[in-house]
C-alpha cells in the first residue's frame, strides 16, 4: 500500500513538473490525462481563471477535473447526480463544460501533491531540491455533507525553501435565505488558527451593464461593465462600501452592439474588413446591402445630382441630414447619440463611400461604379472637392481632372477593391479623429499610431479596427461617467497605451481606477451582485472567506433552484436566489 502511494506521489509530481516546465518555455498544450478519468490543466496568469469568482485568484494554478464524457455516455449521468446539486447540464449533448471529481478522489490528489512537496519525505524518488509548483485546485462534486466544490493546496516558502502548505476547502450552497454574523466568522477564524486579533477586508461588485440577447436569433454580446470596490475594515455583513474605499471599473466591450449609437459606423468598419480580406485572399464575402437600389443606380443618381447642382455644398447637407435621420433610433440614449451624427463636412469621396459601402454586393458593382465616376471626371461633368491629405488613387484622379488630364486606370484585378478600401480608410480615420479631438479626449499626436499612412494598407485597417474598439469602450462607459471628463480622458489614454503595445483583443478587461465619490450614485442605493468578506491575520494566505452572490460562482455545478415564478423580475437581492460561498483553510508546517 505505502509503496503504491509513494509511486503515485512521485508520478503525480513528475507530471505536474513537466507541465510547469513546458509553460515556462512557452509551450502551451491541452490538458494532460493523469488517469483515465482525470485531467490536469495549467492556467497561466491573465487567462480566465475559475477561481477568480471566489478568491479573486489570478495567478498561475493547476486545475484538476474530470475528463469530459463522450456524448453517448451522457445519458447515464443522472444516476450520478446528488440531490442538491448536479454536474453540468448534458441535455444539449454538446459542450458539457468542466466536470467535477468525487470529494474523496480530490482529497487523494491533494494528499499526493502535499506528500511530494514535504521535505521530510526523503524516501520519495524526487530530485532535490524539490521545485515548488504552483497551487493545485481540484473541482469537487459537492457530494459530501459540507457541499465541498473545490479543494486547494498552496505552498508556503521561506527563502526559496518549502516550509509548509495551506489547504483550502470551498463550499457553496444555493438558498433563498442566509444567516451569518461577522463576529461569528471572526471567532471561527481565531479559533481555527489560534489567533487573538484578525483583520477584515470587504469586496463588493456592482454590475452596471451586461448585454442581453435581442431575440432568439441574435445572441447577447460579451459586453460587461462592473464596478469593483474594496475596503478595510468591514463593519458588518453586506456593508455598503464607504467613500474611503478603493474602486475600479472593469470594462469588457464587444464591438457591434446592435442597439448602440455606433452601429452604423461598425457596419462601415465591417465592410472595410470585407474589402481588406478580399484584397488579401482574393475572395470577398460581400455584406447584405442596406439599400433597396443597386450601387450603380445610387452612384449614377449621385453624379447626376452633382452635375445639376454644379456644386457640392448643398449635396453634402442633403446627404448628411438623410444619414442622420436614417440612423436615429429611440432605443439609443440621445445625449450620447448626438456625439455620433454623420459629419457635416463629408467630401465627394466620403459620400461615395457611404453610398457604395451600403449597396455594393459584387465585384462587377465596383467596376461599373468606378467606370461611371471616371467617365464623369474625364468629361468634366463634375469637379468635386476633396479634403486635403488623401493619397488614394481616386483623389489623385480627381486632382488630375482639375487640369483636364487624367492617367488611364485599368479597372481590373484588385484595383477596384483597393480604390474603395482607400477611400473607406480615409473616411473612417477622419470620423475617429473628429470624435476624439472634438471631445478633447486625445490629440493628433496620441492618435498618430492609429492613423499613420506609412504602414501597409492591411496594417492600417487593423489599427483602425483597434481605434474603433476604443471608441466602443468609451461609448459603453459614457452613461456612467459622461459627466466626469477626466475619467473619460483617463480611460481613453489607458486604451490607447494598451493598443499601441498589444493586438486587438475584445475579451481584454480594461481597468479604470475611480474615486468612490465620483461614482457613489452607481452603488450606494443598489444591491451588489457579489459581496465578500475576507478575514485574515499575518499571512494573507491564511484566511476565512464568506461570499454572497446572485449567480453561481461555481461553473462545474448546477444548483436546483426554487420556483422562480414566486420571485419578482426586478426584486432585490433578498428576493432572489442566493449563492453563499465559504472558504476555510488549515496550515501544515513541514519544518
Curated annotation (Swiss-Prot):
Checking InterPro entries in the record gives: Zwilch
Disulphide bridges:
none
Q: Report the GO terms under cellular component.
A: cytosol; kinetochore; kinetochore microtubule; RZZ complex
**Sections of the chain in a coiled coil:** none
Keyword Aminoacyl-tRNA synthetase on this protein?
no
Q: Mostly located where?
A: nucleus
Which cellular compartments is it found in? Chromosome, Centromere, Kinetochore
- Record PTM Phosphoserine, positions in chain: 88
Instruction: State the UniProt keywords alphabetically.
Output: Cell cycle, Cell division, Centromere, Chromosome, Kinetochore, Mitosis, Phosphoprotein
Cell division is among the record's keywords: yes
Pfam families given for it? Zwilch
Q: Which GO terms describe its biological process?
A: cell division; mitotic spindle assembly checkpoint signaling; protein localization to kinetochore; regulation of attachment of spindle microtubules to kinetochore
Function, as annotated, reads:
Essential component of the mitotic checkpoint, which prevents cells from prematurely exiting mitosis. Required for the assembly of the dynein-dynactin and MAD1-MAD2 complexes onto kinetochores. Its function related to the spindle assembly machinery is proposed to depend on its association in the mitotic RZZ complex.
* Further comment found in the protein's record: ZWILCH gene is deleted in a patient suffering from colorectal cancer with chromosomal instability.
Q: Which family does it belong to?
A: Belongs to the ZWILCH family.
- Complex and partners: Component of the RZZ complex composed of KNTC1/ROD, ZW10 and ZWILCH; in the complex interacts directly with KNTC1/ROD.
**What is the protein name stated in its UniProt record?**
Protein zwilch homolog
Annotated source species? Homo sapiens (Human)
Q: Which gene encodes it?
A: ZWILCH
